[in-house]
Amino acid sequence: MRIPFANKAWDRACRPFGAVVAILLFTSVPFTSVQSFAQTPLEKVLEEIETTSSLLDEEPFDIVTLTAEASGRSVKVAPIDFPNRRIPTDTKDGEKLQVTILLFPTRRYEVAWNDVARIWLYEQMILERAKTMVREKIFGEAFEHLNYLMVNYPQTPGLASLRQEFLIESAADLLQRKSLPHAMAVLEELQKSFPNYQRDRVRNLITTVSNQLVQAYFDKNDLATAKAMVARLDKDYSADPLPVVGQWKEKFLELAEEYRARALQLRDRKDYLGARREAKRMLEIEPEIDGGKDLLRDLLREYPIARVAVFQQSNHPDTAALADWPAFRSGQLIEKPLFEFRGTGAEGGQYRFSLGSFQQSDDQFELDLAIQNAGNVGVPNSLMLSQSFLRRATIGKPDYSPAWAAILDSVSVFGPERLKLRFRRPHVLPQAFLQWPIERTSAESGPPGVLYRVQGDEGTVRRFAWSASTPAAEFQPLEIHEVLYQDPNEAINQFLRGDVEIIDRLFPADARRLRGASVARTVTVENYALPTVHMLVPRRSNPYLDDREFRRALLYAINREAILKGEILGGGEAAQSQVISGPFPRGAVDTDPIAYAYNTSVENLAYDPRLAKVLILIASNKLRVAAEKKGDKLPPIPKLSLGVPNYEAARVAGQAIIEQWKLIDVPGELVVLDRIPSPKEESPVDIVYLTASVWEPATDAERLFGVGAPAQTNNQFIVQALSQLGAARNWIQVRQGCQDLHSLVAAHLPILPLWQVGESFAYRSELIGIAPKPLGLYQDVQKWRYRVP
């Protein structure tokens, strides 16, 4: 079978048929070979000259058939140079026809016109073939033949009439097979090209097809497309309106009024979310319906609710969560960190003291904190705060923090609004340790700046309700609902329909498609400010996973570049998304402030499954010798269970990794986890796929690899490097310490670094005030408002 769009030349040739090109080629019945054609005079002649392939695959030629008296043979000749490619009809006795037989291209032959029974011109043969194809409903190849003639032989007699027949018959066939959009396109092409051809029949067919098409969209509840179809018909046929247009306009108006009635009923029952949904459907169908916009505006004013599509939820909100995205997201909404990370700077992160102002001493031994409005509702005073600092530095307390205890020396209180922290040694960023949530001063009052509290769960919906002591502003959400989805496609469809206003943490390939979609005017895809780092962390001990060379083999066996670009990014590129060689982000460019910890001299291990097999052999031999010395027998490589968090990017990447490990004879299975267990818990899997927000490497290194951390390690080299990093007294030492740690991680592989990914979210245009490039979805939730129609 020939592939029509195989090259640019064919693409150019297809243009004369316009919109029907793709339609007919990809919706017509399967192609049929020419051998199946009935034995017409043309087919007999072609069989005689041994031409059984498609004429379009041949160089142009003509056929001369001699009379019975002159042998009756048919001869394949080069195209004859007739004026305008018309066979002369006024030849005289004795005149001869000069031809070039293709078997002897250098010779010219003369044939008496009296001996010529028939001449088949190349374009006439193609036309005859096309006629046969139309009769036998082989519309794909018929199109090819007709299109070839239109480009190369537009004056061929009978071409225009056959094209008309082709369009009407193919449209009828498409209609019979219920391919309504394609049938409509072909009929409109016919009407446009031949406005007087069977005018009444074509118009009746257009009316029938358009009515069925709108009905089909209506039955699928695709009202937007049905409405758009009617609007186009109204515009395109304004001079001679189709009766179907008026009929559907009346039906849409009736439907819009039904939605309005339901919206009012739901409003009376205080079901504001349902009422708003019905009101939005009403306006989608009839934007100018009387009182429609006022109704939606009133609903948004009375009780605005924002709905967020999420793919993970957490029962433990935490503003300082390093490797738990849903915990960090919900923590932003219902908690307030003591110190809030606001972005990257020339020397580490930029922080804001949520309760007032702070000042670090020049020698970096002290941190002065000034509390504003101490004692007000929800605002702790200096004594309460000092007790919190001391508890977190005391062994045995539930919220004990080893890293904080290692640097805190003392806390001094100077009245209710001021206190001073003194450290055992200078530290460049002590405030980075203080991102834990502000403790509540009472059960009734939350910290200042916290607007919402958990209302409860209803199935897959988690409700957060307004809890601030001050009333919400006009059109500010009184509730935020996080709706849990397993299928990203379902979430996107609901988002495009307006059933949810936001999608958090889009699958990167979906984000790319949404940016380029036709709906880009009504939705915004926004990047988060900083990337997440993805890695594999061994959690269960066995002889193989404990061996460094075996872990290196696992890393060599992963085609990280292909998985990242092909599977996760959907074949695209993204500045923030790239393969990494260590535990820290490298940023979008080398000068990115967040890249201060990344050691660019450590190269990424290239994909090399053969080397991976060699390393496995080396590791196995070493382990076998060690086992034999103990009198034991080395067990075979066990099936490795890879636990991935339950969201699309991790599931896709995890499955690809499992398949690539199989290529080096390492069996594996994918385990989807709703929650990544901590190192303190018994691990249900051998390896976990970890996503970490390592945005302040100077302190996050300890939070990643330290005791109780998600990638906890007892590797003595890593532990020593963490200790040296913690003792760094200036930014030169911090950078060097981080980069040394990067090198050690690449050498010892307590984790298998994969890639960093630029995360994103999407929101609809009716919701405004969302921060550009935020660190988290709810970073400036206090600014969210609904745009009224």
Where are these regions (language model features)?
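Ligand/substrate-recognition segments at binding pockets and active sites
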Residues: 240-241, 459-460, 618-691
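Long beta-strand-rich cores associated with HINT superfamily self-processing modules
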Residues: 763-789
